[in-house]
C-alpha cells in the first residue's frame, strides 16, 4: 500500500477529534535510530494539500517520561475557549498522567507551561 503522508517516529498517537491534527508521544520501550532516550510530545498538521511526504510539525515539547497511551479529548463547551482543541492526556511509563493544552502548544510552538501531573 502506498504511503500518503508520514512522520518517522516510534510513537503513541492520537487524532484531534474536530481538527486536522495528530499528536505523537515517544513510545515506551522503543529505540529510535539515534538511540536517544529522550521523551517528547509533538503535534503535526494533517496537510494533504502539499506535495511533501512529511507531515508538518507544529509544536514539540519535552515530556517527563515516555508514553504508554495518548488520548486527545473533545473541545470545551465554551466558544473561544482556551481549550478549544481539547486536552492531550498521556499515560506515562512511570505510572503518572501528564496533561497538555494543544492549543497553547500550537500557538507557542512548544509547551509554554509544564504538563499537569497526577
What are the residue ranges of the model-derived segments?
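WD40 beta-propeller repeat fold
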Residues: 1-118
Amino acid at each position: 500500500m502506498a504511503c500518503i503522508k508520514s512522520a518517522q517516529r516510534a510513537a503513541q498517537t492520537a487524532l484531534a477529534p474536530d481538527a486536522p491534527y495528530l499528536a505523537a508521544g515517544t513510545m515506551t520501550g522503543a529505540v529510535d535510530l539515534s538511540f536517544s532516550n529522550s521523551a517528547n510530545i509533538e503535534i503535526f498538521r494533517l496537510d494533504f494539500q502539499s506535495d511533501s511526504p512529511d507531515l508538518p510539525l507544529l509544536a514539540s515539547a519535552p515530556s517527563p517520561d515516555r508514553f504508554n497511551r495518548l488520548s486527545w479529548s473533545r473541545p470545551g463547551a465554551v466558544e473561544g475557549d482556551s481549550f478549544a482543541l481539547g486536552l492531550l492526556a498521556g499515560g506515562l511509563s512511570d505510572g503518572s498522567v501528564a496533561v497538555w493544552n494543544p492549543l497553547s502548544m500550537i500557538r507557542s510552538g512548544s509547551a509554554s507551561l509544564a504538563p499537569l501531573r497526577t
